[in-house]
Protein backbone atom coordinates (compact mmCIF):
# COMPACT_ATOMS: atom_id res chain seq x y z
CA UNK A 1 0.00 0.00 0.00
CA UNK A 2 1.52 3.31 -1.06
CA UNK A 3 1.61 6.18 1.40
CA UNK A 4 -0.13 9.44 0.56
CA UNK A 5 2.56 11.58 -1.07
CA UNK A 6 0.74 14.92 -1.42
CA UNK A 7 0.74 15.73 2.27
CA UNK A 8 -0.17 14.31 5.60
CA UNK A 9 -3.43 13.13 7.06
CA UNK A 10 -4.48 13.58 10.66
CA UNK A 11 -7.53 12.16 12.34
CA UNK A 12 -8.84 14.27 15.18
CA UNK A 13 -11.02 12.25 17.51
CA UNK A 14 -11.87 15.05 19.91
CA UNK A 15 -13.06 17.45 17.21
CA UNK A 16 -14.61 14.72 15.02
CA UNK A 17 -12.85 16.19 12.00
CA UNK A 18 -10.90 14.57 9.20
CA UNK A 19 -8.33 17.08 7.95
CA UNK A 20 -6.45 16.60 4.72
CA UNK A 21 -3.55 19.00 4.25
CA UNK A 22 -2.21 19.37 0.71
CA UNK A 23 0.09 22.05 -0.77
CA UNK A 24 -2.64 24.29 -2.17
CA UNK A 25 -5.73 23.53 -0.08
CA UNK A 26 -7.08 22.97 3.39
CA UNK A 27 -10.19 20.83 3.44
CA UNK A 28 -12.34 20.11 6.50
CA UNK A 29 -14.79 17.21 6.59
CA UNK A 30 -16.93 16.15 9.49
CA UNK A 31 -17.18 12.44 10.43
CA UNK A 32 -19.58 12.22 13.31
CA UNK A 33 -19.41 8.58 14.34
CA UNK A 34 -16.06 6.97 13.49
CA UNK A 35 -13.78 8.58 16.05
CA UNK A 36 -13.35 8.75 19.83
CA UNK A 37 -12.18 11.46 22.21
CA UNK A 38 -8.48 12.07 21.51
CA UNK A 39 -6.40 12.30 18.34
CA UNK A 40 -3.49 10.36 16.89
CA UNK A 41 -1.39 10.60 13.77
CA UNK A 42 -1.32 7.80 11.25
CA UNK A 43 -0.64 7.19 7.59
CA UNK A 44 -3.25 6.13 5.05
CA UNK A 45 -3.13 5.42 1.37
CA UNK A 46 -4.78 7.85 -0.95
CA UNK A 47 -6.94 5.04 -2.28
CA UNK A 48 -8.32 4.08 1.15
CA UNK A 49 -8.89 7.68 2.18
CA UNK A 50 -10.98 8.57 -0.83
CA UNK A 51 -12.86 5.24 -0.83
CA UNK A 52 -13.91 5.52 2.81
CA UNK A 53 -14.89 9.19 2.97
CA UNK A 54 -17.48 10.95 0.83
CA UNK A 55 -17.46 14.69 1.00
CA UNK A 56 -18.64 17.89 -0.69
CA UNK A 57 -16.04 20.55 -1.33
CA UNK A 58 -17.69 23.78 -0.29
CA UNK A 59 -14.82 26.27 -0.02
CA UNK A 60 -14.80 28.85 -2.83
CA UNK A 61 -12.33 31.72 -2.95
CA UNK A 62 -12.76 35.06 -4.61
CA UNK A 63 -9.96 37.32 -5.85
CA UNK A 64 -7.66 36.95 -2.84
CA UNK A 65 -6.31 33.41 -2.61
CA UNK A 66 -5.04 33.97 0.92
CA UNK A 67 -8.42 34.96 2.34
CA UNK A 68 -10.85 32.72 4.18
CA UNK A 69 -13.05 30.68 1.80
CA UNK A 70 -16.66 31.56 1.32
CA UNK A 71 -19.09 28.95 2.60
CA UNK A 72 -22.10 29.39 0.34
CA UNK A 73 -21.42 28.87 -3.36
CA UNK A 74 -24.93 29.82 -4.47
CA UNK A 75 -24.74 33.06 -2.52
CA UNK A 76 -21.40 33.91 -4.10
CA UNK A 77 -22.72 33.27 -7.61
CA UNK A 78 -25.85 35.34 -6.98
CA UNK A 79 -23.89 38.29 -5.61
CA UNK A 80 -21.38 38.23 -8.45
CA UNK A 81 -24.26 38.18 -10.95
CA UNK A 82 -25.79 41.17 -9.17
CA UNK A 83 -22.53 43.13 -9.46
CA UNK A 84 -21.72 43.13 -5.75
CA UNK A 85 -18.14 43.94 -4.73
CA UNK A 86 -17.40 40.67 -2.92
CA UNK A 87 -14.10 41.78 -1.43
CA UNK A 88 -15.66 44.91 0.06
CA UNK A 89 -18.64 43.00 1.42
CA UNK A 90 -16.47 40.31 3.03
CA UNK A 91 -14.26 42.90 4.71
CA UNK A 92 -17.25 44.71 6.15
CA UNK A 93 -19.37 41.80 7.38
CA UNK A 94 -17.68 38.44 6.77
CA UNK A 95 -20.17 36.52 8.91
CA UNK A 96 -22.88 36.94 6.28
CA UNK A 97 -21.00 34.61 3.95
CA UNK A 98 -21.13 31.78 6.47
CA UNK A 99 -24.92 31.74 6.42
CA UNK A 100 -26.52 28.92 4.45
CA UNK A 101 -29.83 30.79 4.10
CA UNK A 102 -29.87 34.33 2.68
CA UNK A 103 -32.43 36.44 0.84
CA UNK A 104 -30.43 38.34 -1.77
CA UNK A 105 -32.88 37.60 -4.57
CA UNK A 106 -35.87 38.69 -2.48
CA UNK A 107 -34.00 41.86 -1.50
CA UNK A 108 -33.21 42.59 -5.13
CA UNK A 109 -36.83 42.18 -6.24
CA UNK A 110 -38.11 44.24 -3.31
CA UNK A 111 -35.78 47.18 -3.96
CA UNK A 112 -36.40 47.06 -7.71
CA UNK A 113 -40.13 47.34 -6.98
CA UNK A 114 -39.40 50.51 -4.98
CA UNK A 115 -37.49 52.16 -7.81
CA UNK A 116 -33.89 51.29 -6.97
CA UNK A 117 -31.56 50.56 -9.89
CA UNK A 118 -29.50 47.38 -10.10
CA UNK A 119 -26.36 49.47 -9.57
CA UNK A 120 -27.75 51.00 -6.38
CA UNK A 121 -28.77 47.57 -5.08
CA UNK A 122 -25.26 46.21 -5.74
CA UNK A 123 -23.75 49.21 -3.94
CA UNK A 124 -26.05 48.75 -0.93
CA UNK A 125 -25.15 45.07 -0.54
CA UNK A 126 -21.43 45.74 -1.10
CA UNK A 127 -21.37 48.28 1.73
CA UNK A 128 -23.85 46.59 4.06
CA UNK A 129 -24.11 42.89 3.17
CA UNK A 130 -26.24 42.12 6.22
CA UNK A 131 -29.10 43.54 4.17
CA UNK A 132 -29.45 40.15 2.45
CA UNK A 133 -30.40 38.49 5.76
CA UNK A 134 -33.68 40.42 6.03
CA UNK A 135 -36.89 38.60 5.09
CA UNK A 136 -39.39 40.04 2.58
CA UNK A 137 -41.95 40.41 5.40
CA UNK A 138 -39.48 42.35 7.55
CA UNK A 139 -38.48 44.59 4.64
CA UNK A 140 -42.08 45.37 3.75
CA UNK A 141 -43.06 46.22 7.34
CA UNK A 142 -39.99 48.39 7.86
CA UNK A 143 -40.58 50.22 4.59
CA UNK A 144 -44.16 50.99 5.60
CA UNK A 145 -42.91 52.41 8.91
CA UNK A 146 -40.39 54.61 7.13
CA UNK A 147 -43.16 55.90 4.89
CA UNK A 148 -44.78 57.36 8.02
CA UNK A 149 -41.82 59.76 8.00
CA UNK A 150 -40.51 59.91 4.43
CA UNK A 151 -42.88 61.09 1.73
CA UNK A 152 -41.86 58.85 -1.19
CA UNK A 153 -40.25 55.51 -2.02
CA UNK A 154 -37.61 57.26 -4.10
CA UNK A 155 -36.58 59.38 -1.12
CA UNK A 156 -36.07 56.23 0.95
CA UNK A 157 -34.02 54.69 -1.87
CA UNK A 158 -31.83 57.81 -1.89
CA UNK A 159 -31.28 57.51 1.87
CA UNK A 160 -30.39 53.83 1.50
CA UNK A 161 -27.93 54.66 -1.26
CA UNK A 162 -26.18 57.15 1.03
CA UNK A 163 -26.42 55.09 4.19
CA UNK A 164 -27.63 51.48 3.83
CA UNK A 165 -26.99 50.88 7.53
CA UNK A 166 -29.77 53.31 8.41
CA UNK A 167 -32.41 50.90 7.10
CA UNK A 168 -30.82 47.48 7.55
CA UNK A 169 -28.93 47.87 10.84
CA UNK A 170 -31.84 46.58 12.91
CA UNK A 171 -34.69 44.22 12.14
CA UNK A 172 -36.64 45.18 15.26
CA UNK A 173 -39.66 46.78 13.65
CA UNK A 174 -41.63 47.00 16.89
CA UNK A 175 -38.89 49.13 18.45
CA UNK A 176 -38.84 51.35 15.35
CA UNK A 177 -42.61 51.77 15.48
CA UNK A 178 -42.55 52.64 19.19
CA UNK A 179 -39.79 55.22 18.67
CA UNK A 180 -41.68 56.88 15.83
CA UNK A 181 -44.85 57.11 17.97
CA UNK A 182 -42.88 58.50 20.91
CA UNK A 183 -41.01 61.15 18.90
CA UNK A 184 -44.26 62.31 17.32
CA UNK A 185 -45.85 62.41 20.79
CA UNK A 186 -43.25 64.87 22.13
CA UNK A 187 -44.08 67.32 19.36
CA UNK A 188 -41.47 66.56 16.72
CA UNK A 189 -42.74 67.24 13.22
CA UNK A 190 -42.51 64.93 10.24
CA UNK A 191 -39.79 67.21 8.85
CA UNK A 192 -37.79 66.85 12.06
CA UNK A 193 -38.16 63.05 12.08
CA UNK A 194 -37.08 62.94 8.44
CA UNK A 195 -33.99 64.94 9.39
CA UNK A 196 -33.27 62.44 12.17
CA UNK A 197 -33.76 59.50 9.82
CA UNK A 198 -31.44 61.03 7.23
CA UNK A 199 -28.67 62.26 9.52
CA UNK A 200 -28.86 60.15 12.67
CA UNK A 201 -30.78 56.95 11.82
CA UNK A 202 -29.38 55.18 14.88
CA UNK A 203 -31.90 57.25 16.85
CA UNK A 204 -34.56 54.78 15.71
CA UNK A 205 -32.45 51.77 16.66
CA UNK A 206 -32.05 53.09 20.20
CA UNK A 207 -34.22 51.45 22.80
CA UNK A 208 -37.35 53.45 23.52
CA UNK A 209 -36.18 53.96 27.11
CA UNK A 210 -32.91 55.51 25.93
CA UNK A 211 -34.70 58.08 23.78
CA UNK A 212 -37.10 58.82 26.62
CA UNK A 213 -34.18 59.46 28.99
CA UNK A 214 -32.65 62.04 26.65
CA UNK A 215 -35.94 63.81 25.97
CA UNK A 216 -36.73 63.98 29.70
CA UNK A 217 -33.22 65.28 30.40
CA UNK A 218 -33.58 68.01 27.77
CA UNK A 219 -37.00 69.00 29.10
CA UNK A 220 -35.56 69.35 32.60
CA UNK A 221 -32.56 71.31 31.26
CA UNK A 222 -34.87 73.71 29.44
CA UNK A 223 -36.93 74.32 32.57
CA UNK A 224 -33.81 74.90 34.68
CA UNK A 225 -32.65 77.56 32.20
CA UNK A 226 -35.98 79.34 32.33
CA UNK A 227 -37.62 78.06 29.16
CA UNK A 228 -41.37 78.04 29.75
CA UNK A 229 -42.15 75.41 27.10
CA UNK A 230 -40.03 72.25 27.59
CA UNK A 231 -41.48 70.57 24.49
CA UNK A 232 -40.53 73.56 22.33
CA UNK A 233 -37.02 73.51 23.83
CA UNK A 234 -36.61 69.83 22.93
CA UNK A 235 -37.83 70.44 19.38
CA UNK A 236 -35.37 73.29 18.88
CA UNK A 237 -32.40 71.33 20.21
CA UNK A 238 -33.16 68.19 18.18
CA UNK A 239 -33.81 70.16 15.00
CA UNK A 240 -30.54 72.05 15.41
CA UNK A 241 -28.61 68.93 16.39
CA UNK A 242 -30.14 65.69 15.08
CA UNK A 243 -27.27 63.67 16.59
CA UNK A 244 -28.12 64.51 20.17
CA UNK A 245 -30.42 61.51 20.74
CA UNK A 246 -27.57 59.09 20.01
CA UNK A 247 -25.38 60.64 22.72
CA UNK A 248 -25.41 60.09 26.46
CA UNK A 249 -27.11 62.49 28.85
CA UNK A 250 -23.81 62.64 30.74
CA UNK A 251 -22.01 64.05 27.69
CA UNK A 252 -24.70 66.62 26.93
CA UNK A 253 -24.81 67.77 30.55
CA UNK A 254 -21.01 68.15 30.63
CA UNK A 255 -21.08 70.28 27.48
CA UNK A 256 -23.84 72.54 28.80
CA UNK A 257 -21.72 73.13 31.90
CA UNK A 258 -18.64 73.72 29.72
CA UNK A 259 -20.42 76.47 27.80
CA UNK A 260 -21.81 78.05 30.96
CA UNK A 261 -18.51 78.14 32.87
CA UNK A 262 -16.16 78.91 29.96
CA UNK A 263 -18.08 81.92 28.69
CA UNK A 264 -19.55 83.06 32.03
CA UNK A 265 -23.09 82.89 30.68
CA UNK A 266 -26.22 83.45 32.71
CA UNK A 267 -29.23 81.19 32.15
CA UNK A 268 -30.82 83.43 29.54
CA UNK A 269 -27.60 83.75 27.51
CA UNK A 270 -26.93 80.03 27.73
CA UNK A 271 -30.48 79.27 26.60
CA UNK A 272 -30.10 81.48 23.52
CA UNK A 273 -26.76 79.84 22.68
CA UNK A 274 -27.82 76.21 22.93
CA UNK A 275 -31.13 76.83 21.16
CA UNK A 276 -29.11 78.37 18.35
CA UNK A 277 -25.58 77.88 17.00
CA UNK A 278 -24.28 76.27 20.19
CA UNK A 279 -26.62 73.28 19.90
CA UNK A 280 -24.18 71.44 17.66
CA UNK A 281 -21.50 71.45 20.35
CA UNK A 282 -23.69 69.47 22.74
CA UNK A 283 -22.86 66.08 21.21
CA UNK A 284 -19.09 66.64 21.05
CA UNK A 285 -16.72 64.77 23.31
CA UNK A 286 -16.32 67.09 26.28
CA UNK A 287 -12.56 66.50 26.39
CA UNK A 288 -12.29 67.39 22.70
CA UNK A 289 -14.32 70.57 23.17
CA UNK A 290 -12.10 71.69 26.07
CA UNK A 291 -8.85 70.91 24.23
CA UNK A 292 -10.05 72.66 21.09
CA UNK A 293 -11.07 75.80 22.97
CA UNK A 294 -7.76 75.85 24.87
CA UNK A 295 -5.90 75.70 21.54
CA UNK A 296 -8.01 78.50 20.02
CA UNK A 297 -7.39 80.62 23.08
CA UNK A 298 -3.64 79.99 23.04
CA UNK A 299 -3.32 80.75 19.31
CA UNK A 300 -5.33 83.96 19.46
CA UNK A 301 -3.57 85.12 22.62
CA UNK A 302 -0.24 84.67 20.80
CA UNK A 303 -1.55 87.06 18.11
CA UNK A 304 -2.45 89.74 20.63
CA UNK A 305 -6.15 89.01 21.15
CA UNK A 306 -7.81 89.68 24.49
CA UNK A 307 -9.98 87.24 26.45
CA UNK A 308 -13.03 89.23 25.40
CA UNK A 309 -12.10 88.99 21.71
CA UNK A 310 -11.53 85.24 21.96
CA UNK A 311 -14.92 84.69 23.57
CA UNK A 312 -16.65 86.94 21.03
CA UNK A 313 -14.98 84.98 18.22
CA UNK A 314 -16.08 81.56 19.50
CA UNK A 315 -19.59 82.62 20.55
CA UNK A 316 -20.23 84.15 17.13
CA UNK A 317 -19.05 80.97 15.45
CA UNK A 318 -19.22 77.94 17.81
CA UNK A 319 -18.48 75.57 14.91
CA UNK A 320 -14.84 76.64 15.17
CA UNK A 321 -14.56 74.25 18.13
CA UNK A 322 -15.02 71.35 15.71
CA UNK A 323 -11.78 72.21 13.89
CA UNK A 324 -8.79 70.04 14.75
CA UNK A 325 -6.02 71.99 16.47
CA UNK A 326 -3.55 71.80 13.57
CA UNK A 327 -6.18 72.68 10.99
CA UNK A 328 -7.27 75.74 12.95
CA UNK A 329 -3.69 76.95 13.43
CA UNK A 330 -2.79 76.34 9.78
CA UNK A 331 -5.81 78.28 8.50
CA UNK A 332 -5.04 81.25 10.74
CA UNK A 333 -1.40 81.22 9.59
CA UNK A 334 -2.44 80.95 5.93
CA UNK A 335 -4.67 84.02 6.16
CA UNK A 336 -2.14 86.11 8.05
CA UNK A 337 0.62 85.25 5.59
CA UNK A 338 -1.56 86.93 2.95
CA UNK A 339 -1.73 90.19 4.96
CA UNK A 340 -5.17 89.54 6.38
CA UNK A 341 -5.25 90.81 9.95
CA UNK A 342 -6.41 88.85 12.97
CA UNK A 343 -9.08 91.50 13.59
CA UNK A 344 -10.53 90.77 10.13
CA UNK A 345 -10.64 87.06 10.99
CA UNK A 346 -12.27 87.75 14.36
CA UNK A 347 -14.96 89.81 12.63
CA UNK A 348 -15.48 87.22 9.87
CA UNK A 349 -14.90 83.81 11.48
CA UNK A 350 -16.73 81.85 8.77
CA UNK A 351 -13.72 82.23 6.47
CA UNK A 352 -12.41 79.23 8.42
CA UNK A 353 -15.12 77.11 6.77
CA UNK A 354 -13.04 77.03 3.59
CA UNK A 355 -10.15 74.64 3.03
CA UNK A 356 -6.61 75.99 2.94
CA UNK A 357 -6.36 75.28 -0.80
CA UNK A 358 -9.58 77.23 -1.43
CA UNK A 359 -8.35 80.13 0.70
CA UNK A 360 -5.04 80.29 -1.16
CA UNK A 361 -6.55 80.09 -4.63
CA UNK A 362 -9.20 82.72 -3.90
CA UNK A 363 -6.74 85.08 -2.27
CA UNK A 364 -4.50 84.80 -5.34
CA UNK A 365 -7.44 85.51 -7.67
CA UNK A 366 -8.53 88.53 -5.62
CA UNK A 367 -5.01 89.97 -5.58
CA UNK A 368 -4.78 89.50 -9.36
CA UNK A 369 -8.10 91.31 -9.66
CA UNK A 370 -6.53 94.29 -7.89
CA UNK A 371 -8.21 93.86 -4.50
CA UNK A 372 -6.63 95.20 -1.33
CA UNK A 373 -7.06 92.35 1.14
CA UNK A 374 -6.39 94.54 4.16
CA UNK A 375 -9.56 96.54 3.48
CA UNK A 376 -11.63 93.82 1.80
CA UNK A 377 -14.65 92.21 3.43
CA UNK A 378 -13.15 88.72 3.58
CA UNK A 379 -16.47 86.92 4.02
CA UNK A 380 -16.44 86.19 0.28
CA UNK A 381 -13.61 83.73 0.94
CA UNK A 382 -16.21 81.37 2.40
CA UNK A 383 -18.98 81.96 -0.14
CA UNK A 384 -20.30 79.24 -2.42
CA UNK A 385 -18.38 78.75 -5.65
CA UNK A 386 -21.17 80.23 -7.77
CA UNK A 387 -21.60 83.30 -5.60
CA UNK A 388 -17.85 83.86 -5.25
CA UNK A 389 -17.18 83.61 -9.00
CA UNK A 390 -19.96 86.11 -9.74
CA UNK A 391 -18.42 88.56 -7.26
CA UNK A 392 -14.91 87.98 -8.64
CA UNK A 393 -16.19 88.73 -12.14
CA UNK A 394 -17.58 92.09 -10.95
CA UNK A 395 -14.37 92.96 -9.11
CA UNK A 396 -12.25 92.11 -12.15
CA UNK A 397 -14.39 94.38 -14.31
CA UNK A 398 -13.55 97.38 -12.16
CA UNK A 399 -9.86 96.53 -11.70
From Swiss-Prot:
Transit peptide: 1-57
This protein's record includes keyword DNA-binding: yes
Taxonomy, superkingdom: Eukaryota
Annotated phenotype, changing residue 251 to A: Strongly reduces transcription termination
Keywords: DNA-binding, Mitochondrion, Phosphoprotein, Repeat, Transcription, Transcription regulation, Transcription termination, Transit peptide
PANTHER family: TRANSCRIPTION TERMINATION FACTOR 1, MITOCHONDRIAL (PTHR15437:SF2), TRANSCRIPTION TERMINATION FACTOR, MITOCHONDRIAL (PTHR15437)
The protein's name: Transcription termination factor 1, mitochondrial
A single BP term in Gene Ontology: termination of mitochondrial transcription
Role, per record: Transcription termination factor. Binds to a 28 bp region within the tRNA(Leu(uur)) gene at a position immediately adjacent to and downstream of the 16S rRNA gene; this region comprises a tridecamer sequence critical for directing accurate termination. Binds DNA along the major grove and promotes DNA bending and partial unwinding. Promotes base flipping. Transcription termination activity appears to be polarized with highest specificity for transcripts initiated on the light strand.
Outcome recorded upon mutating residue 169 to A: Strongly reduces affinity for DNA. Strongly reduces transcription termination
One GO CC term, this protein: mitochondrion
A GO MF term: double-stranded DNA binding
Complexes and interactors: Monomer.
Post-translation changes: Phosphoprotein with mostly four phosphate groups. While the DNA-binding activity is unaffected by the phosphorylation state, only the phosphorylated form of the protein is active for termination activity. Functioning seems to be regulated by phosphorylation.
Family, as annotated: Belongs to the mTERF family.
SMART domains: Mterf
Amino acid sequence: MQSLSLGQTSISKGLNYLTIMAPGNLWHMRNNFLFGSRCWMTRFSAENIFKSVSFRLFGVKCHNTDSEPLKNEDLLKNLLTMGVDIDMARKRQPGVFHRMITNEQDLKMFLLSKGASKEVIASIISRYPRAITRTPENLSKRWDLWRKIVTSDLEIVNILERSPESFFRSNNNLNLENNIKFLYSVGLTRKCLCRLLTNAPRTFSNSLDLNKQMVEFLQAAGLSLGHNDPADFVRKIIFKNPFILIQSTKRVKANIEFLRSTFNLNSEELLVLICGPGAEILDLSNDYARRSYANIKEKLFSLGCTEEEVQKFVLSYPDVIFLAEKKFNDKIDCLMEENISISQIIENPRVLDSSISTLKSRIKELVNAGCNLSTLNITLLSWSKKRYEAKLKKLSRFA
